[in-house]
Amino acid sequence: MPSSDVCKAGSHRHSGWIQSLKKPGPFNLDAPENPEETLKSAFSSKILIIGAGGLGCEILKDLALSGFRDLSVIDMDTIDITNLNRQFLFNESNIDEPKANVAASMIMKRIPSTVVTPFYGKIQDKTIEFYKEFKLIICGLDSVEARRWINSTLVAIAKTGDLIPLVDGGSEGLKGQARVIIPTITSCYECSLDMLTPKISYPICTLANTPRLPEHCVEWAYLLEWPRVFLNASVDSFSKQEVFEPLDGKNSNFEPDNIRHIDWLVKRSIERANKFQIPSSSINRFFVQGIVKRIIPAVASTNAIIAASCCNEALKILTESNPFLDNYMMYVGEDGAYTYTFNLEKRSDCPVCGVLSEVYDISASSTVTLKDILNHYSKSYNLQNPSVSTAAGTPLYLASPPALQVATSKNLSQPILSITSVDVNLVITDKNLSTSLSVQLREC
């Protein structure tokens, strides 16, 4: 849609947003003077989507249909035939092409008003300046390592004065989660690493001597038997020992996408199961490949729900029309549709966003303002442009971006006890601080 035609109240599909922005409400006490410009500014914001897989495709579609016109997407993968059942922006003719390129092309073809810039490669290969270009980043990743990297990068950027909100989505079968991370203000991804489910592993002694499950038999064939038979074997030795066709290539490294290799594991796993009187009816190509590739079945409906939540948070953050998620939403779809929202607390000992600590004594009748407190610590810590929130993640004053600075600046002149209470921890961030500064308000 042309930028001049973003908002025509009453006739445009975004007229509902215009009306909601015009009217003050319990979460929108100060309606913008010019809601059309507010919406235009939000829809013109540069947004980066990390990941163009099942969740990333849904996020791209939702953002484009919502009206966002300046999107970028980065992904290091190419399209595989197994992606086509749920990653709807791709088809068979796109196999082996970069996901980011094809996804961007398809979105712009179907929604010409949206410009999507693709980047094919690793997020780690981009510079800090690249990420500073965006007002919001949304993750649709399936990698813990990648999430940790972008989280620490955005925290580092925040410490230089540029605050870029991160909306993180994830899905696993019929379960999913969405969370909002305001770097250095709310808990970061690193704060909640202990919540992650540990990878399933089996003791080698169980696999070698006392298998009890079909999974044990598959792991034995994959981890112990394959290396024993083929570690230094030639292609010829493989064809002599087995009824299957020879390995492709010049070595005998296991390839989980090579159906001949999978068939070999199926055969050996069934033999192992029969030897130990373990039911083997479930051992087939799909079962074996799922174990060796650590595949968690992807469900399209879960991706759609989580993507919708992520895009809803993007709308709330960029239009400031409602409070954004505070700060974690979990979804469970195994027995109906269940969601639960709670606040993940910021860890003071977090290696990425951990805090310094101070105590500020204050009386119940004190008229000390938020600005007075910031000035007090600006002297001792040489702060230049500090932001402050409660430890629970409620922003009191954000120095950047400009829209949030304007929205929260009125709190500076307010008595601190009129906007929070004693025994509350304040979290101050500034580019001159190596980490966040925690200030406990203590009644004296």
Curated annotation (Swiss-Prot):
ATP binds at residues 54-78. GO terms for cellular component: cytoplasm; cytosol; nucleus. It comes from the Eukaryota. SUPFAM superfamilies: Activating enzymes of the ubiquitin-like proteins (SSF69572). GO terms for biological process: protein neddylation. It is an enzyme of class 6 (ligase). Its EC number is 6.2.1.64. Keywords: ATP-binding, Ligase, Nucleotide-binding, Ubl conjugation pathway. One of its GO terms (molecular function) is ATP hydrolysis activity. It catalyses: ATP + [NEDD8 protein] + [E1 NEDD8-activating enzyme]-L-cysteine = AMP + diphosphate + [E1 NEDD8-activating enzyme]-S-[NEDD8 protein]-yl-L-cysteine. Pfam families: E2_bind (PF08825), ThiF (PF00899). Pathway: Protein modification; protein neddylation. The active site is at C205. Catalytic subunit of the dimeric uba3-ula1 E1 enzyme. E1 activates NEDD8/ubl1 by first adenylating its C-terminal glycine residue with ATP, thereafter linking this residue to the side chain of the catalytic cysteine, yielding a NEDD8-uba3 thioester and free AMP. E1 finally transfers NEDD8 to the catalytic cysteine of ubc12. Belongs to the ubiquitin-activating E1 family. UBA3 subfamily. Heterodimer of uba3 and ula1. Interacts with NEDD8 and ubc12. Interacts with but1 and but2. This is NEDD8-activating enzyme E1 catalytic subunit. The lineage of its organism: Eukaryota, Fungi, Dikarya, Ascomycota, Taphrinomycotina. The gene is uba3.
